Amino acid sequence: MVAFIDAHREAYGVEPICAVVPIAPSVYYERKARERAPERRPARARRDEALTVEVERVWREHHAVYGVRKVWKQLRREGYAVARCTVGRLMRRLGLAGAVRGRAFTVTTVADSAVARPPDLVARQFTAMRPNQLWVADLTYVATWRGFVYVAFVIDVFSRRIVGWRVSSSLRSDLALDALEQALYARPGVAAAPLVHHSDRGVQYLSIRYTERLAEAGIERSVGSAGDSYDNAMAESVIGLFKTEVIRRRGPWRGVEDVEFATLAWVAWYNDDRLLEPLGYVPPAEFEQAYYDRQTAPDSVAVLN
């Protein structure tokens, strides 16, 4: 309305226009005065202007996947004293929204009934008291212009940190094995304490080479059923985030190189920056570091005393 009056005031005058539109001349003049002197604007308007910049920054810095709750949590972590309802109001004004997860489970497992299956040591209890106590592994596929691309993950249950991953244009046993090798490289000395590796009954995870590598590393095997998302729920959950936050939002994909680069960036962000609700809205790396800090704290106190 103010813009309309600005456009026609030279021809008709402010008061005559206000006589036929739903705005008083005093309101118009006050708004124009605030444009010339921003300090005259209400405190809420000035605060909204400053917060709007930060809300949009957080949303964009986190790959445009955060909804109201996580944008609010991130702002609070950064020291902004802001209410969740305020963040929601500003995001609606900006037209910002978080990623919405679709169907969480897609069957990618090809089971081999002829291969003996190790016992299920997890029984759907995806909990761990320390890092390197329980790893879960799974894979998914991505449709590209050049055919399907496959992505394998190895995840530490304690912090939900992705410790190994690999992208390939072939659903071969080496795909899962390469992800495992990356995890073992990232976590040297895992055999120092008992570690269980849990997967579904996919042929990649029951292959002789994969089985031998686990045994060589001193890792105990656990296998759920085939095609049952609940038997590998944590891996399915992380893969669901990957598909929602990367694959569906940034496609279509040209080929394996594009998927690999995007996965590299997402895994780094997920491990170091993404807030996870089950961890108390802290990133996996921070949650894990807090565990190690607690383990060393008594020794530090003893030295000081």
Q: What positions do the PLM features span?
A:
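Charged DNA-binding/catalytic regions of mobile-element recombinases
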Residues: 1-305
